[in-house]
């Protein structure tokens, strides 16, 4: 799931806010560290929301924040947060897909290691679609 983050440079590093996840903040000494910490903060924050039976926040397009006056001096970007591990125990299902589509999925997975396998790919796409709806 892609979440927009707004990064502010401060004297001793970077502070990150996550506008689509109220109350979620992070920081880092370097820009890279701040972005990695933001991914972890979002995951932990959403895990807590699930434990409290709260509705999951929807992710808005990054364009919604780029031209906002309150983020004028911020770096606005997105981080990809895998939320599938928070969805509970995996259940095996049997699906039917056209051969060409399956071939294209396999080709895509081969060049995108963040998708571990077909199941992970389909789970992440379904999660992203349902949380963006």
Swiss-Prot record:
It comes from the Viruses. Pfam families: HicB_lk_antitox (PF15919). To E.coli ydcQ. This is Uncharacterized 14.9 kDa protein in rep-hol intergenic region. It comes from Haemophilus phage HP1 (strain HP1c1).
């Amino acid at each position: 799931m892609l979440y927009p983050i707004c990064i502010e440079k401060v004297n001793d590093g970077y502070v990150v806010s996550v506008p689509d996840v109220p109350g979620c903040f992070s920081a880092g000494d370097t820009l890279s560290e701040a972005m990695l910490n933001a991914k972890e903060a979002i995951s932990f924050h959403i895990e807590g929301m699930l434990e409290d039976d709260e509705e999951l926040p929807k992710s808005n397009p990054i364009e919604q924040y780029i031209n906002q006056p309150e983020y004028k001096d911020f770096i606005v970007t997105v981080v990809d947060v895998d939320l599938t591990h928070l969805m509970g125990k995996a259940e095996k299902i049997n699906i039917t897909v056209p051969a060409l589509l399956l071939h294209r999925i396999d080709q895509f997975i081969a060049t995108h290691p963040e998708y571990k396998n077909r199941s992970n790919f389909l789970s992440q796409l379904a999660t992203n679609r349902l949380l963006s709806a």
